[in-house]
């Protein structure tokens, strides 16, 4: 299960977005089973945008690439989507983290293209509300625990298996943990 192409964020008690996104799902085997079709039918009946996928592992790694770069850069550099579209350190680190996920996905047997980060930034980022923000930045602003362990933590841990360095994810892990540690101060 994955969600795609969404820039939803919460402003007080209201959800704000330019792109509502869709739910992507499928069997690990890639087979389009009756179970997958039943989920698609149910979501259709509920009016929920969805995409049954024969390549769900690819979609999940792609989603990790986006979250790992976008969410962590927004949180670490205190930037909305519009700020991450601008050239500079935040965008450079976002891209570097995305590249680490692309390399790791390839080592894990999932062939994300080497320019997958650029494709996302060029195709999707312009559609996001410039004042919008991903969930991890919302967490930091609300002083809630973030998903840094699920993003940088997982990437760092899995990369160790291959002896792959992860300087961007190391930076994000350290920086976001520092931010979280400062919540009580």
Show the residue positions of the predicted features:
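Internal alpha-helical scaffold of NAD(P)-dependent oxidoreductase catalytic cores
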Residues: 13-68, 72-115
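Short, surface-exposed loop and linker segments with low hydrophobicity and enrichment for Pro/Ser/Thr
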Residues: 4, 62-64, 167
């Amino acid at each position: 299960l994955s969600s795609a192409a969404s820039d939803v964020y919460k402003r007080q008690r209201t959800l704000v977005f330019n792109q509502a996104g869709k739910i992507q799902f499928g069997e690990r085997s890639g087979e389009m089973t009756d179970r997958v079709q039943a989920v698609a039918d149910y979501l259709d009946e509920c009016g929920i945008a969805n995409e049954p996928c024969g390549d769900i592992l690819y979609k999940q790694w792609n989603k990790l690439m986006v979250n790992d770069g976008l969410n962590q850069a927004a949180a670490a550099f205190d930037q909305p989507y519009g700020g991450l579209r601008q050239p500079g350190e935040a965008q450079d680190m976002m891209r570097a983290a995305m590249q680490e996920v692309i390399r790791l996905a390839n080592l894990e047997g999932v062939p994300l293209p080497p320019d997958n980060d650029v494709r996302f930034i060029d195709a999707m980022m312009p559609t996001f509300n410039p004042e919008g923000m991903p969930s991890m930045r919302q967490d930091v602003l609300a002083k809630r625990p973030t998903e840094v362990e699920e993003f940088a933590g997982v990437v760092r841990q899995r990369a160790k298996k291959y002896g792959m360095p992860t300087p961007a994810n190391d930076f994000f892990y350290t920086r976001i943990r520092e931010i979280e540690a400062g919540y009580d101060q």
